Amino acid sequence: MAEVDISHSKKKKQDKTENDAADTGDYMIKPQSFTPAIDTSQWPILLKNYDRLNVRTGHYTPISAGHSPLKRPLQEYIRYGVINLDKPANPSSHEVVAWIKRILRVEKTGHSGTLDPKVTGNLIVCIDRATRLVKSQQGAGKEYVCVARLHSAVPDVAKVARALESLTGAVFQRPPLISAVKRQLRIRTIYESKLLEYDADRHLVVFWVSCEAGTYIRTMCVHLGLLLGVGGHMQELRRVRSGILGENNNMVTMHDVMDAQFVYDNSRDESYLRRVIMPLEMILTSYKRLVVKDSAVNAICYGAKLMIPGLLRFENDIDVGTEVVLMTTKGEAIAVGIAEMTTSVMATCDHGVVAKIKRVVMDRDTYPRKWGLGPRASMKKKLIADGKLDKHGKPNEKTPVEWSRNVVLPTGGDAIIAGAAAAPEEIKADAENGEAGEARKRKHDDSSDSPAPVTTKKSKTKEVEGEEAEEKVKSSKKKKKKDKEEEKEEEAGSEKKEKKKKKDKKEEVIEEVASPKSEKKKKKKSKDTEAAVDAEDESAAEKSEKKKKKKDKKKKNKDSEDDEE
């Protein structure tokens, strides 16, 4: 028996050692020449396929603030939540949304697009912070299943299918008679339509349609009847998709919402409520993603643009003007933005704006502030505290010269700024020369007292050389000034000579003999000359002409009087 027990124990030991070896073999770090890929296909919501994103940098400091969308505390989870609701028939969309607001005891609710009271189906209800995404959901495409009744029989099913197919593309529509909007003609796009079923006996047509937001299916049914030549109207309608959420994406009823809140109130069980409400990130999964560093998150929440240093990862095929979602490393949506760079520029550029913000989703101060911590900002805070800058950080009387030189620049473009920046350097150079001259004088005085004659000679020669250089510079400047003054005087003299010549020409023209033909020529010549002369000279010439004419008239009058006598 003892031998049997010993053999049993040996077998057990062998089995254990084999299992341990297998385990160690599984968990040993294998030598590899490449980084093993992480399978992120099962990661939640915005983090799905995270490894396929382009990496700008992997260096950032993780901050413990914020929560993964599915692991937020319940109250925060509800505030950042959306419900894919199956709207019941008869109550209006606004009534349904108001009931949910009252059931969940929240501040705000919104929906993805109004459904008529009799229409059922998909209605995305946004709660509190998620209401900021309502506009984007209202403009998203929609899908419907409709039952239309034709006013008389159409025997050929193919004819119905052709008529339905012709109602695709851009279509003119006027809102129905019973509608809450102004009945203006508008253009809406119908992307696709399929005939699902046709009952010739009851004249019923069942079809599926994918269309632009704001399309009236009731009007489409009337148009279908007109195309078939029998008339028709809408019998029933159900929305099966709104944006990216459809009937199969966790659609719940009003009863589910009420029951989930009741279960939580009575048994503190969150699971049902978390199943009914989804994180708002669910409706942003169709957007291109930009992953932001934790230190840049709060700045974006305050409205700052996303710059290159704050970017961690980015998606392929981003163009300028593309709508993108800015997300944290935990998978939270920060904001919806508009890209200012393409994917290739993001990969190569080291500065600039990546995206500007369209709508901020995240609350401010969810993450700590991480701007204003650099040396420049801390210096500014210190100056404000000491009263050397005003409370807005603007210079006052006590502001140090160094700070104001760096901060306050004249307006008027780069040229003026460059000139202003260059001017102080010349002044500095003159000041330095002056200081150097004073230092030389001091050295000279000191050297005269000192007994070493060699050093004094050197200093004297240096001073003499410096003075000669200064005199040369001054003399060259004076020469330049004199040359400029002489040039100006020469130009002024030449202008005076030209004016005198013009006056002489005018006088010669005026002194010509007055005859009817010569007077006309004289006027033409005077006009040509007057065009080239200043306004003052013109007035003088006109006065002299008038005087001469008066004299001529007087002479003629005298001659006529003499003839009469």
Curated annotation (Swiss-Prot):
Keywords: Isomerase, Nucleus, Phosphoprotein, Ribonucleoprotein, Ribosome biogenesis, RNA-binding, rRNA processing. It is found in: Nucleus, Nucleolus. One of its GO terms (molecular function) is RNA binding. Residues 1-28, 433-565 are annotated as: Disordered. Pfam families: DKCLD, PUA, TruB_C_2, TruB_N. Residues 546-557 have a biased composition (Basic residues). GO terms for biological process: pseudouridine synthesis; rRNA processing. The modification Phosphoserine is found at residues 450, 515, 539. Residues 287-362 form the PUA domain. GO terms for cellular component: cytosol; nucleolus; plasmodesma; ribonucleoprotein complex. Plays a central role in ribosomal RNA processing. Probable catalytic subunit of H/ACA small nucleolar ribonucleoprotein (H/ACA snoRNP) complex, which catalyzes pseudouridylation of rRNA. This involves the isomerization of uridine such that the ribose is subsequently attached to C5, instead of the normal N1. Pseudouridine ('psi') residues may serve to stabilize the conformation of rRNAs. This is H/ACA ribonucleoprotein complex subunit 4. It comes from Arabidopsis thaliana (Mouse-ear cress). The lineage of its organism: Eukaryota, Viridiplantae, Streptophyta, Embryophyta, Tracheophyta.
